[in-house]
Amino acid sequence: MAAGNWTRLSEFILMSFTSLPTEIQLLLFLVFLIIYLVTLMGNSLIILVTLADPMLHSPMYFFLRNLSFLEIGLNLVIVPKMLRTLLSQDTTISFLGCATQMYFSFFFGVAECFLLATMAYDRYVAICSPLHYPVLMNQRTCTKLVAASWFPGFPVATVQTTWLFSFPFCATNKVNHFFCDSPPVLRLVCADTARFEIYAIVGTILVVMIPCLLILSSYTRIAAAILKIPSAKGKHKAFSTCSSHLLVVSLFYISLSLTYFRSKSSNSPENKKLLSLSYTIVTPMLNSIIYSLRNNEVKNALSRTFHKALALRICIL
């Protein structure tokens, strides 16, 4: 393409749901606002309760706190701008704002992939080596595992975002999405992006497949260990300790795979928007609900924390 067709953009326009009637957009605003608030409150509550209750000062809940923090971070990066767009029809986002949104969406997404694998390893050690669990999963080891889970997000987000935004863009600045994701922004580039696309595909496969294989390996060994337990009660107790995590992993990877690994012919921009909503907005809300309602220890901790707060308030009055 001739250099005269290149342009230096100062802002982008997020098309998101602009094709829908105003009434539908207002309805979506209310729905997404409720989901957003439930996500923030649910995950914040998990963080506070697991910090406040001594009974939850274990590796499993240390990892859960980090997962809740990542879910909050991903929502804060994407949802507020989407809500403002739906309510005020302000669809513009600055060049720097778009790059920042893309960077942190990559960072939190990649970190979550590896953290879910770390949580699977934690369940594997707890079920397959219960006597050695306190030694193997001490505070220092857990801190290292969390750091190792967060770290891949930095190079992936830095390389992919800086590389993409170093390309020249065409005259159009309309991003056909509700946030600055890589594929819709890449369509605006006026340059040969073959090398970048190869890097993006290989990077996405590695980021998704490496944690996925670690999770499958952990749960294969967990299943084998559970089948060796003689009593049905023992099997149920062992499975219940990892059922919440298994459900969260399934929701995350199914929605992520449907979004990024479907063929272009079967994955229209509108379908991709709906699928992106599932892993960026709906799944973080469901995660907090799953870990709150399906986990007896968290429910009991919530009850204890509530009664302590109520008793303290009564004493003050």
Label for each model-derived stretch:
Residues 1-317:
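Transmembrane helical core of 7TM receptor-like proteins
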